[in-house]
């Protein structure tokens, strides 16, 4: 890997994102599509941009992402995590601000499995007393 790019792996739920940070003008490319095309929801786009806005580096980098697995929310979270890790690789002094914002920690919440005898993970069948 060349010294001109920084790499970060991000994960959230079942989504995994590989993020490459290169000096540039602020283009974000996800699976060879622009951010606006890939994410229809504005909230997902906002989540992806959060670490860049916090570190005031929106126009400093071009970001290339390959993401797989999960849904829209999980993929957005995985990309955010990957961008955060790549930014820390680029400049370790950003770690404190990113940590305080809560972007460094991997969100460990996963879907709880369905149990036998229950309708969902915790929903029980209706109880009849008589």
From Swiss-Prot:
Chaperone as a keyword of this entry, yes or no, is no
Q: What family name appears in the similarity comment?
A: Belongs to the universal ribosomal protein uS9 family.
The entry's protein name is: Small ribosomal subunit protein uS9
Q: What stretches pass through the bilayer?
A: none
The protein's UniProt keywords, in alphabetical order, are:
Ribonucleoprotein, Ribosomal protein
What InterPro entries does the record point to? Ribosomal_Su5_D2-typ_SF, Ribosomal_uS9, Ribosomal_uS9_bac/plastid, Ribosomal_uS9_CS, Ribsml_uS5_D2-typ_fold_subgr
Organism superkingdom: Bacteria
> What does the entry list under GO cellular component?
cytosolic small ribosomal subunit
- Return one GO MF term: structural constituent of ribosome
GO biological process terms held by the UniProt record: translation
Q: Is Ribosomal protein tagged as a keyword?
A: yes
The UniProt entry, under PROSITE patterns, shows:
RIBOSOMAL_S9
Bridged cysteine pairs (disulfide): none
């Amino acid at each position: 890997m060349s010294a001109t790019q920084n790499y970060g792996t991000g994960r959230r739920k079942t989504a995994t994102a590989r993020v490459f940070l290169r000096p540039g003008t602020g283009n974000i490319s996800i699976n060879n599509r622009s951010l606006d095309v890939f994410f229809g929801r504005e909230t997902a786009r906002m989540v992806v941009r959060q670490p860049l806005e916090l570190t005031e580096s929106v126009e400093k980098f071009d970001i290339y992402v390959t993401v797989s697995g999960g849904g829209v929310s999980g993929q957005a979270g995985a990309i955010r995590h990957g961008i955060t890790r790549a930014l820390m690789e680029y400049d370790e002094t950003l770690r404190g601000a990113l940590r305080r914002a809560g972007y460094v920690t991997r969100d460990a919440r996963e879907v709880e499995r369905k149990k036998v005898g229950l309708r969902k993970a915790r929903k029980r069948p209706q109880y009849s007393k008589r």
